[in-house]
Swiss-Prot record:
Coiled coil feature spans: 51-121
Keyword Nucleus: yes
Primary localization: nucleus
Name of the protein in question: rRNA-processing protein EFG1
Length: 305
């Protein structure tokens, strides 16, 4: 039995990422960056004399790779938190928007300065809540603005929530933060209408596909019909040719038939003439034979007497 063929592994695949020591590209993955950091740190820890300029370049490369790794980790964490707390922030944004509208109505309906002042304070408070739901940092865990009882509430989370509320309220009072209520409502309604738009887009794409399919089939169908019409025309031409040939055959065969008929008529006339001649001969013979019989009968009578 022949020995199994040994598989050869080669390093012919394309390298991904930078091959140089210095500088870190943005497109590198986190695993490759961390591996590069470990390799460079291992080189720096070797008890081998190294040029000072090269050591500085390696240290700068390590620092650049670490910054890039931190950015990638932060982006991944932000995306994770956005996806995780997306629904709760959406509902709390809607609730804060309703409260802002109610507070603004109170300001318009206030019949005294004291009530108007209290209503304006409520507007600022609820605007801060709306800013809280919009501008809450994504790199930390989202703390619910309206906690569900004592289950979600802790002393630390309550303290952090009130701190961020106060910061947003201060920024709104100083004009440093502008919260657009219409934009917040648009963001809230966008998610509701997203499915409708996607459904409409699917129907439009389906209609376009049907139109494309019809346009693709139409030339083929027209071509098939054209071929069928050509075949029908060819069949009609063949039938006409057959009819013409039949007429020619009938014309060609008509002359012999007429000759046969003419000979038959001539033969019949000859037979009729011969029959008439025989009849005449017989009649003459009868007329000649009658007097003789009468004479014979008279002679017999005389003898008997």
């Amino acid at each position: 039995m022949a020995p199994p063929t040994q598989r050869r592994y080669t390093n012919n695949r394309k390298r991904r990422g930078p091959r140089e020591v210095g500088g870190a590209k943005t497109g590198d993955g986190l695993t490759r960056i961390m591996k590069r950091i470990r390799d460079l740190e291992r080189v720096l820890k070797r008890p081998v004399p190294m040029d000072e300029q090269k050591r500085i370049e390696l240290e700068r490369a390590v620092a650049a790779y670490k910054v890039q790794a931190e950015d990638i980790i932060g982006d991944r964490k932000n995306k994770k938190n956005v996806e995780k707390y997306r629904m709760i922030r959406f509902f709390e944004r809607q609730k804060a928007s309703r409260k802002v509208k109610q507070a603004r109505k109170l300001v318009e309906q206030a019949d005294s300065d004291a009530k108007k002042k209290d209503a304006e304070a409520l507007v600022v408070k609820y605007m801060a809540d709306l800013a809280y739901t919009i501008h809450f940092p994504n790199d930390i865990k989202y703390i619910s603005l309206y906690p569900n009882g004592a289950v979600d509430e802790t002393a630390e989370s309550s303290k952090q929530r009130e701190k961020m509320r106060a910061e947003f309220a201060e920024q709104i009072k100083n004009g440093e933060l502008d919260v657009d209520l219409e934009r917040a409502e648009q963001v809230a309604t966008t998610k509701k209408s997203k499915k409708k738009r996607e459904a409409g887009a699917d129907e439009e794409v389906k209609g376009d596909d049907e139109d494309d399919e019809f346009l693709e089939k139409a030339p083929k169908k027209a071509k098939v019909e054209e071929e069928e019409s050509d075949d029908d025309e060819e069949d009609e031409e063949d039938d006409d040719d057959d009819d013409d040939s039949d007429d020619d055959d009938s014309d060609d065969s008509g002359e012999p038939q007429m000759e046969i008929k003419r000979t038959a008529d001539e033969k019949q006339t000859k037979e009729e003439e011969s029959d008439s001649e025989e009849f005449v001969d017989e009649s003459e013979a009868e007329s000649e034979g009658k007097p003789e019989s009468e004479e014979n009968s008279e002679d017999q009578d005389d003898e008997s007497e």
